[in-house]
């Protein structure tokens, strides 16, 4: 707990320092400044959604490196200065980027407009495992609500709309351009939604076991059941009692696949799979991209299609 509050004080101090050194006037639109729109985004989905809207009309920065787990990441003074200098700062929610509310309160006039991409989306509560872990004070960051809304193609559309609205407000001269890009990308997300919906209807099984509670919104949208090994943060480990229940559940439901994510340790998933005679496969949370994915030029929609193909092994989808 002391470490958590110490971190928040450091963040607050950094923002105050940057604010004191920066321009105290309120930021204007991109055109009034005479340069391109500058948007800073926190982690990969926020970057992807924003880039699809802005394209060549602005510069979009990714704050958290794609190879870094974003749940417990905190900004450096350099990161804070980058946010301070931007026109817009796009983040998923205070339940994912838990440092954002403190940072925003600490900033003076002239900072970027903060854009909560999940604004207006009904968030689900965290898992029982998550609450149990935090009751014992074992984790510094609280995810009382599930922040993983971007993993539902339907809710991803809402995030794109939220981001678009703020971009248009900041740079109204390019309104038609941004809205055209947004509509085109949303159409692709709608096609992705149809693909998931059609596949889910063909599934013989509905449950799948994941490394952590990241796919609740996706499961709810398509009538599936996510069975998580741990809570909302991938570095959590289940209690012995929870793991024993999972083993029993997996055997009773003839589970053949345990899903894990590439940018977090797969140790627990590997152990469970070994003990029940299952295999492991990647189910990508899109919290960051691997170097291989980046080299291939893969995007949100590509990887969500890969996720669907991986899920077919558990759901026993009829051809």
Swiss-Prot record:
A lipid is attached at residue 21 (N-palmitoyl cysteine). Its main location: membrane. The keyword Zinc applies. It is found in: Cell membrane; Membrane raft. Keywords: Cell membrane, Ion transport, Lipoprotein, Membrane, Palmitate, Signal, Transport, Zinc, Zinc transport. One of its GO terms (biological process) is zinc ion transport. Pfam families: ZnuA. It is a lipid-anchor. GO terms for cellular component: membrane raft; plasma membrane. The complex is composed of two ATP-binding proteins (ZnuC), two transmembrane proteins (ZnuB) and a solute-binding protein (ZnuA). Belongs to the bacterial solute-binding protein 9 family. This is High-affinity zinc uptake system protein ZnuA. The lineage of its organism: Bacteria, Bacillati, Bacillota, Bacilli, Bacillales.
């Amino acid at each position: 707990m002391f470490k958590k509050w110490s971190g928040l004080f450091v963040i607050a101090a950094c923002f105050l320092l940057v604010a004191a050194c920066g321009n105290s006037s309120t930021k204007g639109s991109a055109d009034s400044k005479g340069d391109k729109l500058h948007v800073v985004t926190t982690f990969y989905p926020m970057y992807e959604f924003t880039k699809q809207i802005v394209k060549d009309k602005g510069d979009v920065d990714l704050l958290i490196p794609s190879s870094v787990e974003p749940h417990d990441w905190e900004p450096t003074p350099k990161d804070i200065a980058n946010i301070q200098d931007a026109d817009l700062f796009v983040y998923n929610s205070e339940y994912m980027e838990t440092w954002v509310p403190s940072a925003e309160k600490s900033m003076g006039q002239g900072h970027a407009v903060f854009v909560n991409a999940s604004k207006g989306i009904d968030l689900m509560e965290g898992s029982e495992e998550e609450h149990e872990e935090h009751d014992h004070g074992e984790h510094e960051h609280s995810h009382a609500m599930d922040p993983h809304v971007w993993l539902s193609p339907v809710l991803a559309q809402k995030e794109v709309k939220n981001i678009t609205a703020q971009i248009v407000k900041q740079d109204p001269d390019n309104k038609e351009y941004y809205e055209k890009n947004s509509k085109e990308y949303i159409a692709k997300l709608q096609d992705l939604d149809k693909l998931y919906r059609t596949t889910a209807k063909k599934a013989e099984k509905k449950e799948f076991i994941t490394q952590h509670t990241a796919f609740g919104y996706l499961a709810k949208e398509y009538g599936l059941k996510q069975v998580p090994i741990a809570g909302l943060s991938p570095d959590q480990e289940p209690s012995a009692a929870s793991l024993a229940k999972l083993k029993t559940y997996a055997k009773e439901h003839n589970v053949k696949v345990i899903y894990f994510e590439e940018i977090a340790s797969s140790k627990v998933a590997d152990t469970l799979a070994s003990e029940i005679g299952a295999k492991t496969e990647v189910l990508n949370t899109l919290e960051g991209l691997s170097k291989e994915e980046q080299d291939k030029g893969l995007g949100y929609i590509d990887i969500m299609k890969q996720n669907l193909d991986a899920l077919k092994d558990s759901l026993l989808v009829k051809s």
